Amino acid sequence: MIWKLLKKITNNSDIAIDLGTANTLIWIKGEGIVLNEPSIIARDTINNKICAVGQEANKMLGKTHPGLETIRPLQDGVIADDDMTNEMIKHFLKKINKNNFSRPRIIICIPSGITKLEERAIKEAAEVGGNASEVYLIKEPMAAAIGIGIDVSSPQGHMIVDIGGGTTEIAVIAL
C-alpha cells in the first residue's frame, strides 16, 4: 500500500508534511525539505488577526502584551485548534510558494495512537489549509523508516524510534 502511495508522488506539486507539535517540516519531491519552522502562531486577541507564524511567532514567545497571544495549535501530536492549524498550513504553503498549485496532493505524518476523529481533523486541515485534492495519512514510524531508506517491503524487521517534540514512538517494522 505505502509503496503504491509513494510511487504516486511524481511531480513537484506533491507535498509531504510532518505536522509536529514543536516543528512543521515540508518536503517536496526533487527539492527535499523546503521548510522547517516552529508550529506556533501569534494572534491579536482583540480582532483575532494572525500577526506571525512559525519563526516570527516563535520570536514573540514569552514577550507578548495582553492583546497578543502565542498559540501552539498542535498538542501531543494532534490538532488542538482546528482554525489555527488551517491558517498555519496556509501560511507555510504560501511561504514556500506552493499554494498556487491548483490542488496539490498532500501526505501527512500522524502519530500511531490517534483516534479516527483526530485523523479526520488532520485530513480536513490539509484539505482546507492546503487546498489539497487528495490527502494521505502515514504513521510517523513508517514515514521515519522510509525517510532513512529502510526497505519496508522486505521481511527483515527494523526497530524505529521516532522522538518528536510532543510524542515518542517505538515500532518494529517488517513485511
Task: Please report, for each region that a protein language model flagged, where it lies by residue.
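Nucleotide/phosphate-binding catalytic cleft detector across ATP-hydrolyzing
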Residues: 1-165, 171-175
